[in-house]
Amino acid sequence: YFYRRGSSVHWFYTQPTGNAEYFYNEVLVTPENALNSTYYMMNGFSEGYMGIQQTTSGEHKVLFSVWSPYTTDDPEDIPEEKRVKVLRKGANVTIGEFGNEGSGGQSWLHYNWTAGTVYKALVRVKPDGNGSTVYTGYFYADGEWKLIASFSRPETNTWYKGAYSFLENFDPINSIYPRSVLYKNQWMRLASGEWKEITGAKFSCDDTGRSGLRYDYSGSVDQAKI
């Protein structure tokens, strides 16, 4: 399955020193790269991710997901005390669960994002002081910041760690079509309130690429866009 769908590729950003609370990123999908079954993930963190998606049927969505600390591929198996809880959700946002690649809480907004337009996302990660961490995702569109959702993850005490982005095809039938995405203008805000620009990143791919099963992947820097 993973060989047939192609290698997912990632940018792991070099975070500034200190407790990072917010991560800001921008994405541009050009018209020729707006393909079905593609996830243009913008704001990843050690416990989840957020980005825009074009589904297998061509729907456009904004997704924000947080993994449970309980290891399983079936969300039904997660004990109640280890479930990711939703604290808030934005207008027209759907809340659900996901599985198969870990499990946890998920939110999505049906939003007709347009190829050729730059979109912005902001994710906040902050410990609540009671043994859980709160994750909040925002998406900027139509001239305003839209709340996607705010989740609480139990048994977690962390700030924003593991900032990254990825490009993924999730349907093997579409893996023959080349696709790319541009990420730019990455910033993090520390818990102290200071904003720091991210100027470094490391390119990587999943096991499909690292094992040599597929060679049709690449990453590059183009005038501050990656």
Question: How should each PLM-predicted stretch be described?
Answer:
Residues 1-93, 108:
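Secretory/extracellular carbohydrate-interaction modules
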Residues 27-31, 68, 125-127, 141, ...:
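Short beta-strand segments enriched in hydrophobic/aromatic residues
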Residues 96-119:
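Short, aromatic/His-centered strand-loop micro-motif at the edge of beta-sheets
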Residues 113-147:
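Carbohydrate-binding surfaces in secreted/extracellular proteins
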Residues 133-183:
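An exposed acidic His-Trp-rich patch
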